[in-house]
């Protein structure tokens, strides 16, 4: 897969940098560890990084509309994340910031590094381990929750508000004419 992707991207642009890790296959916990690591973000070039998982699609050519934000991803459904994913220090019921699905997300590299140097991605900082740890056996929380919630908790950069995030990407809830989607078919149910 690496050789195929590397050759394809080389033919598209010399500005695309493919980084190969020494993993044959990764699970959710490994993926979250990689993306939550300083090493990963230091290997990347540029100010803005588009995370594009293979189950994502880009529908429109309007990414410029979102460059002012340091983190933007599809909005989450509050009931899906409320008691499991929210940091202890913030009352999200009072805020319109349930944003951050990472499968298709645009991020400022420096802000990701600032989060990593400010707070560790451990269960003690989040509620996730109260009920889901026995089911998932995750050692750390999902990287998208770690970054977007930590940015808000520690005032690092600007996380896009929900009304902007829904124009950027869809996943569980349908919004008209987004930039793209991550597992967007979930919104068709």
Feature locations, PLM:
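Short, solvent-exposed loop/turn segments at secondary-structure junctions
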Residues: 1-3, 23-26, 55-58, 77-80, ...
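Active-site-proximal specificity loops/subdomain of glycosyltransferases
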Residues: 1-47
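Conserved beta-strand scaffold positions in the cores of enzyme catalytic domains, especially
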Residues: 18-20, 71, 158
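Short, conserved loop/helix-junction motifs that constitute active-site signature segments
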Residues: 43-45, 64-67, 107
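Short, high-confidence coil segments that cap the C-terminus of an alpha-helix
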Residues: 46, 69, 154-157
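Short beta-strand-to-loop acidic/aromatic patch adjacent to the donor-nucleotide binding site
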Residues: 46-58
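Conserved donor-nucleotide/metal-binding helix-loop-beta segment in metal-dependent transferases, i.e.
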Residues: 56-92
């Amino acid at each position: 897969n690496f050789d195929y992707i590397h050759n394809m991207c080389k033919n598209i642009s010399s500005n695309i940098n493919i980084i190969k890790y020494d993993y044959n296959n990764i699970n959710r916990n490994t993926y979250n560890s990689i993306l939550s690591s300083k090493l990963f973000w230091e290997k990347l070039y540029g100010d803005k990084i588009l995370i594009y998982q293979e189950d994502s699609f880009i529908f429109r050519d309007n990414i410029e509309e979102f460059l002012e934000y340091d983190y933007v991803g599809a909005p989450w459904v509050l009931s899906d994340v409320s008691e499991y994913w929210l940091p202890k220090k913030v009352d999200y019921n009072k805020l319109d910031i349930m944003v951050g699905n990472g499968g298709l997300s645009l991020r400022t590299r420096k802000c990701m590094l600032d989060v990593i140097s400010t707070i560790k991605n451990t269960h003690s900082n989040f509620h996730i381990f109260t009920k889901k740890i026995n089911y998932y056996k995750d050692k750390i929380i999902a990287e998208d929750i770690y970054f977007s919630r930590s940015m808000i908790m520690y005032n690092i950069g600007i996380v896009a508000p929900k009304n902007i995030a829904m124009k950027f990407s869809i996943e569980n809830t349908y919004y008209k004419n987004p930039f793209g989607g991550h597992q967007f078919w979930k919104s068709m149910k």
